Regions:
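Short Pro-Gly-centered beta-turn/loop motif in secreted/extracellular proteins
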Residues: 91-100, 240-246, 339-350, 442-450, ...
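Structural motif
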Residues: 50-71, 303-317, 322, 390-395
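A short, solvent-exposed loop/turn motif at the edges and junctions
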Residues: 96-123, 132-134, 347-370
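Bacterial Sec-dependent N-terminal signal peptides
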Residues: 13-54
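Proteolytic cleavage junctions
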Residues: 87, 130-154, 173, 186-190, ...
Length: 537
């Protein structure tokens, strides 16, 4: 037995030797040292996050009075700046991705503007911001050592200064004559002329507000150095009322615009004085900027969705609510499912519209109560991306939008508001008979090689003031490009009809807005006498 074990041991050693030796010498295998419970090696570092592309903001700056593009406007956002070209267009392409950025618009002779964008946090995000700017209403020079009133002709707006009340930033007295620039801001005619986004600073963030009129005032000395009120002094401002509300409150808070935060900040109050139509809100201020007679309002939410012409939900669409019975705006973006929830003033009338860079939706009017409400169907972006908005002042009380369609018998107005689903593929949202508007006409489709006509009728038949003095305003949005029309010369007591423009289409249904700008005693007639319009899908 022992001999067998000995032979087996020799065989085992021979087999090991045949396998080769190690560091312990020929014929032997070096076993690894025993493990001492060493920790496992660390995992490899995670890959770097993908580099985000810069955001882009583009748009057009227009003159708020005539809709023409404004060149040489400096546009600044997040440390990036650009200058508008000849037609007012601009593009900022190197904006770091952010939740939102504040855009500032400035040019000599124009009232400064400002607007916060929607979210730009995604890589390569982009948005379109079109902004109207008001020309300065009155510029005058005076001796700052004497008391002085800066009066705006044709308006109740005014700034009253006491003697020797202005100072340079270093506290010194101004050199030479003082130059004042004062401009009333009337948001009831165009809510977009107001700087900012109708948001006031509030505890915990911001709150929506409505405006009853605003005033921009700035002062410089002979060297062009900006001036403001000296410490311990004040000035009186009078703000011309401008509101879509049927009743002006006897007293409202005063807010000034913070150009750093993009929010309105409450400081003081103003009381309603004078006799209509020459009323004004009067208050006392301790510094100059844009001052607004405002109030924060309680809100409810309008819930809904946005879809394209094919019925697919649209994410990232901008949805805005605009007051019809109050002067204010609110906006939001649709989520990944194309859903939105936007604020409106409680117990009010407002309309809601969705836009993308090149499309616009229908604009339903909503009567809000004290509870959140849901729209009956999705807002539908139209392929034509064309809409017309009519606004006006308190008088005449009733102006009417009229659109002549692609076929001879198509007339969209208060008695036949049209349809977006069937011909004429044009719809008027509502007939506003109580001043201000807005009335919005939306085009779902356009026909090939046709001429559409748009005109405004003074249904009230009153001319003190008429459409010119009201003033009436027509804004056309054509695939993101905006054109604004104000009444031309030539209105008289017999010219109820303002033929504003025609829309001409080509074989591909591309639309061109052709100004007409004529007051007429009789309504325009359709240029298309057939009924066989061919629509583009």
């Amino acid at each position: 037995m022992k001999i067998r074990f000995f032979l087996a041991a020799i065989a085992t050693v021979a087999a090991l030797a045949a396998c080769g030796g190690g560091d312990s010498g020929p014929g032997f295998v070096a076993l690894p040292p025993p493990q001492q419970n060493e920790p496992p090696p660390p995992p490899p570092p995670p890959p770097p996050p993908p580099q985000q592309s810069n955001a882009k903001v583009s748009g057009r700056v227009t003159n708020a009075l005539d809709g023409r593009g404004v060149a040489q406007v400096t546009v600044t956002a997040a440390g990036v700046s650009a200058v508008t070209d000849a037609d007012g267009s601009y593009s900022l392409t190197e904006i770091p991705p952010n939740a939102s950025v504040l855009l500032s618009f400035s040019k000599s002779g124009m009232v400064p503007q400002s607007r916060a964008t929607a979210a730009l946090a995604g890589s390569g995000a982009s948005t379109v911001i079109n902004v109207p700017m008001l020309p300065v209403a009155v510029t005058e020079s005076f001796d700052g050592q004497s008391a002085h009133d800066v009066v705006v002709p044709g308006s109740t707006a005014m700034v009253r200064l006491s003697a020797n009340s202005l100072r340079r930033p270093d506290g010194s007295a101004p050199g030479g004559l003082v130059t004042a620039q004062v401009t009333p801001i009337a948001p009831a005619n165009d809510v977009n002329v107001m700087p900012g986004n109708y948001l006031a600073a509030a505890e915990g963030g911001s709150a929506p507000m409505e405006s009853f009129g605003a005033l921009d005032a700035s002062f410089t000395d002979a060297d062009g150095t900006p001036l403001n009120l000296a410490a311990g002094t004040s000035a009186t401002v009078r703000i011309a009322p401008s509101s879509r509300s049927g009743t002006l409150p006897p007293s409202v808070p005063l807010f000034f615009y913070n150009t750093t935060t993009g929010l309105w900040v409450q400081e003081g109050s103003a009381t309603l004085q004078g006799t209509a139509p020459n009323q004004y809100y009067e208050g006392t201020v301790t510094h100059f900027t844009t001052w607004n007679a405002d109030q924060i309002y309680n809100t409810v939410r309008i819930n809904g969705c946005v879809q394209d012409a094919a019925g697919a939900r649209v994410a990232g669409a901008l949805v805005a609510s605009e007051g019809k019975s109050y002067t204010g705006l609110a906006s939001t973006l649709t989520n990944a499912n194309g859903e939105f929830s936007v604020a409106v003033k409680r117990s009010s009338s407002a309309f809601v519209v969705a836009t993308t860079a090149s499309e616009i939706s229908n604009s339903p009017t909503v009567e809000a109560g004290d509870q959140d409400i849901s729209l009956g169907g999705c807002l539908q972006l139209t392929r034509s991306a064309l809409s017309i908005k009519l606004t006006w002042g308190e008088r005449p009380r009733d102006l009417d939008s009229h659109t002549l369609g692609a076929n001879a018998d198509e007339h969209v107005y208060y008695s036949d508001k049209g349809s977006l689903a069937t011909a004429p593929f044009i719809a008027l949202d509502v007939d506003d008979v109580d001043s201000f508007g807005p009335e919005v006409t939306t085009f779902a489709k356009l026909a090939k090689n046709r001429t559409y006509r748009f005109y405004v009728r003074n249904f009230s038949g009153t001319f003190d003031p008429g459409q010119t003095g009201s003033p009436a305003r027509v804004e056309v949005s054509n695939r993101g490009a905006q054109t604004v029309f104000s009444p031309p010369a030539g209105e008289s007591g017999s010219t109820d009809f303002w033929h504003v423009f025609d829309i001409r289409t080509d074989e591909a249904c591309n639309a061109s807005v052709v100004p007409v700008q004529q007051f007429l005693a009789d309504p325009p007639v359709s240029l298309d006498t057939s009924g066989n319009a061919q629509y583009c899908n």
